Structures are given as structure tokens and as C-alpha cells.
Curated annotation (Swiss-Prot):
A GO term for molecular function: ATP hydrolysis activity
Pfam family, one: TOBE_2
Protein name per UniProt: Fe(3+) ions import ATP-binding protein FbpC
Organism: Streptomyces avermitilis (strain ATCC 31267 / DSM 46492 / JCM 5070 / NBRC 14893 / NCIMB 12804 / NRRL 8165 / MA-4680)
PROSITE patterns noted in UniProt: ABC_TRANSPORTER_1 (PS00211), ABC_TRANSPORTER_2 (PS50893), FBPC (PS51242)
Catalysed reactions, as listed in the record: Fe(3+)(out) + ATP + H2O = Fe(3+)(in) + ADP + phosphate + H(+)
Stored SUPFAM superfamilies: MOP-like, P-loop containing nucleoside triphosphate hydrolases
Length: 345
């Protein structure tokens, strides 16, 4: 492993903001740490960089404990959310900053700056003023600066957080391709699920200073570990349930569950795609409370007639019923997950 955190703990005022975290990052792997504000993800990044001392535990990088190694000698690159470019230096001066700190010659600096600006899509921009750059261009310059000294680990703190949505979506694809091409090992933190799932080989979801779940994007999306992870990923159709065989008793009535699901009391997730609309005479009777256009589909918000928790269904625009209509609901077992942990619903 290139990076290992072993029982890493950080306390602020007696409260553990990083609580005995164990995490490994393999060479050439991109890991995104995902979580709400206050979950400990940025503290984790700062601890690896050496900017935040651990109260307990250890950071091991390249097989060496980092206990007494200062930040500038850890061989890591760090890119902050606000980019922190030097306004008094031009683009080339910003990109070359780390190279100068490492004693590179002028010719080495110039060659590396040209190489990286080409790589991040800004050829010939070395003499441009930082003030003339767009937000996306500033992000590219900050990335080039972080990559310039060839860090063994690149760390990104909300790398696309200040950019508009369309630019974020485009750049996250470019970042993924760039890291794959360079073989860069990346540890990134973000609160944006879409960004993490598009960028990462592995997603780590944090809650209250601990790791709630770790897995590939597909694993985490298909099988959230518990109600917290499911709701954080944006799933709202989550209720307490009692599973017996291949069905569960829920506030929505009997709901089918996948074969092999954990039995007894638990928590049930129904993805919106698994809420199938039918004639009002069939299944669970609901009233359409609202519709929300989501681009690729319409989210239909349903209120069951017996005051059970609301449901969200995903429908094609041409099939979406109007608010006020009464519909029936059936459930598709392919989009149902029995979650771990007790229900908070």
C-alpha cells in the first residue's frame, strides 16, 4: 500500500473529529472520501498532508511512518478548493513553484511547465496573468502546480467545488482520464456524490469521524451499508421493515425483497426506479403530490392514502401523471435493498 492510516484519531476540544480511522490507498488508485460537512473528511486529508497532527494512530506513506516528517518532505501534492494561486506570479510561475522549492534548474522548470500546461489543456499559457483566467482555467493551473514536483500522492480538497455544474461534469471526466494516463495515486475529498462516483476507483463514505462504508462506486450505489449512507446518496424511499422470507412488512404494505435478504426487523430501501405506477385499482393507492423534472426523467412524489411515508417514483416524461391524480403502486424487487443497521425513520 502506498498510504495507510492506522487508527488515525484527531480530537478538537475533547471531541473526536477523526475517530480511529483505518484506510489504505494502493498505488495508482483514486480514492474519494465522501461525506457531509463535519464528517471528518477534510481533517483526514490534512492529517495525511502533515498539516494536522494526530492525537492517536499513525500515517504510513510508502512504508514509512510519517510521525516526525514535516509536510514539505512527505512527497505529496495538495490542491485546495479555492486553488490558492499566487496573484503576483503568472501561470508559469505558479506551476513552477514546487519545482523551485525542490531546486530544479530553470531549464527543467520551463520544460516541466510546458509539459503540464499541454497536459491540462492550457498550451502556451505560461505568461498569462492569473487574474485573466476563468474558474475552470484556474482549476487546471492549480492541478498542474500540484502535479509539477511529481508527488507520489496527489490530494484534492473539494477540487471542483467552486465551478458551475456543467464545467464540473466536464472536468471530472478530464481528471479521471488524466490520472489514468499518468498513473497518479489520488486521495480526494468531496461532498458531491456525482463527482466522487465519476472520479473514483473506490468511494469511502464518512460519518461523524468514522468510515460508514468503503467500496467501488458500483458496490456502494447498489448496496448502501445502512440508512445513513442510503439517504446521503439521495435515496428517500427508506422505511423500517420486518423481513420474513422474500417479503417485508412495511408502512407501504407487503413489499418483495431479494432472495437471501437478512431476516427480521431492519430497514428497507426502494429505489425510485422500483416504484412502478399502475391503475388506481391496483396495488398501493397514492395521490400524486408533486412532480420534479430531473432532465432524464420526472420524479413523481406520491402520498399513500393511509398516511404512510411518501414515495418517490422515477417516470419517463410522457408517462408521468399530473399532481392530484390517483394511481396504484407496485414494487419491483430488482430495485429493493434490505439495509444494515436499525431504521431511523
Amino acid at each position: 500500500m502506498l498510504l495507510s492510516l492506522k487508527a488515525a484519531t484527531v480530537r478538537f476540544g475533547g471531541r473526536a473529529v477523526l475517530d480511529a480511522v483505518d484506510l489504505d490507498v494502493a498505488e495508482h488508485e483514486t480514492v474519494c472520501v465522501l461525506g457531509p460537512s463535519g464528517s471528518g473528511k477534510s481533517t483526514l486529508l490534512r492529517a495525511v498532508a502533515g498539516l494536522q497532527p494526530l492525537d492517536e494512530g499513525q500515517v504510513v506513506l510508502g512504508g514509512r511512518a510519517m510521525d516526525s516528517v514535516p509536510p514539505h518532505k512527505r512527497g505529496v501534492g495538495l490542491m485546495f478548493q479555492d486553488h490558492q494561486l499566487f496573484p503576483q506570479r503568472d501561470v508559469g510561475g505558479n506551476v513552477a513553484f514546487g519545482l523551485r522549492m525542490h531546486g530544479a534548474s530553470r531549464s527543467e522548470q520551463e520544460g516541466r511547465v510546458r509539459e503540464l500546461l499541454d497536459l491540462v489543456g492550457l498550451p502556451g499559457a505560461a505568461r498569462r496573468a492569473v487574474a485573466s483566467l476563468s474558474g475552470g482555467e484556474q482549476q487546471r493551473v492549480a492541478l498542474a502546480r500540484a502535479l509539477a514536483p511529481r508527488p507520489r500522492l496527489l490530494m484534492l480538497d473539494e477540487p471542483l467545488g467552486q465551478l458551475d455544474r456543467s464545467l464540473r461534469e466536464r472536468l471530472v471526466v478530464e481528471l479521471r482520464e488524466l490520472f489514468t494516463e499518468l498513473g497518479t495515486t489520488v486521495l480526494a475529498v468531496t461532498h458531491d456524490q456525482g463527482e466522487a462516483f465519476a472520479l473514483a476507483d473506490r468511494v469511502v463514505v464518512m460519518r461523524a469521524g468514522r468510515i460508514a462504508q468503503s467500496g467501488t462506486p458500483l458496490e456502494v450505489w447498489r448496496q448502501p451499508a445502512d440508512e445513513f449512507v442510503a439517504r446521503f446518496l439521495g435515496f428517500d424511499n427508506v422505511v423500517g421493515a420486518t423481513v420474513a422470507g422474500e417479503a417485508a412488512d412495511t408502512p407501504w404494505g407487503k413489499v418483495p425483497v431479494p432472495e437471501g435478504s437478512p431476516q427480521g426487523p431492519g430497514t428497507l430501501l426502494v429505489r425510485p426506479a422500483g416504484v412502478r405506477l399502475a391503475d388506481a385499482t391496483e396495488g398501493l393507492r397514492c395521490t400524486v403530490a408533486a412532480r420534479t423534472f430531473r432532465g432524464t426523467h420526472v420524479a413523481v412524489h406520491l402520498q399513500p392514502e393511509d398516511d404512510a411515508p411518501r414515495l418517490e417514483a422515477a417516470c419517463a416524461l410522457r408517462d408521468a401523471p399530473e399532481p392530484g391524480e390517483t394511481v396504484g403502486v407496485a414494487f419491483d424487487v430488482a430495485d429493493i435493498v434490505v439495509l444494515g443497521g436499525a431504521s431511523g425513520a
